[in-house]
Amino acid sequence: MVEELFLDKIKQEISERLPGESAHLRMSPEHRLLSSTALKNAQNIRESAVAIVLYRIENRIECILTQRPIYAGNHSGQVSFPGGKKDLSDENLEATARRECFEEIGIEREKGILLGKLTDVYIPVSGFLVKPFVFYHSELPELIPDKREVAEILRFSLFDLKKETLISYTEIKLDDGTIFRNIPYFNLANKKVWGATALILSEMKEILVNME
């Protein structure tokens, strides 16, 4: 009954009272434009999707993140949700999220109940327009990481997002030497989670707060 109540509430919040870009602001660096603003002048937009995988374990709900391997690229070593760009073979972007989740961490495509889609996030540095889909599993699914794409699978308690003590600020240095200061991040699974992933988590956090 508790599980059914949680699912009903979160689906209702996503479908009827999605916080939107206002929820992104808390975890946005000062220099970052809102996605809707940045999209006005964007070119060569690349459609993509991520999977927010929720599951029940014992008496709590957990969520999955992945850490990318170190490589020469804009997202080297970053913590993110399973996901990627849309393939021509994908029927839609939900299918993209399910496929990427299977390819990266081994969750079978047909598994997981779709709870809804959160607000799009545009990533100017890569041109990706990310659509975040929320999936729920009644138990921890079998996880098989693709070593080429995933250095580590991370798990955290979903309701920990409500703890203000998990938010801090750091300095980020990109591969090209650019340094960004006062970047907000979530400290989850002993990792600094910032950027687009933090924006998505910030909206999820507000959804959880609104469910009270």
Predicted regions mapped to residue ranges:
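N-terminal leader/linker segments that precede catalytic domains of diphosphate-processing enzymes
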Residues: 1-80, 85-103, 107-115, 122-140, ...
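NUDIX/MutT-family hydrolases
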Residues: 145-174, 178-183, 187
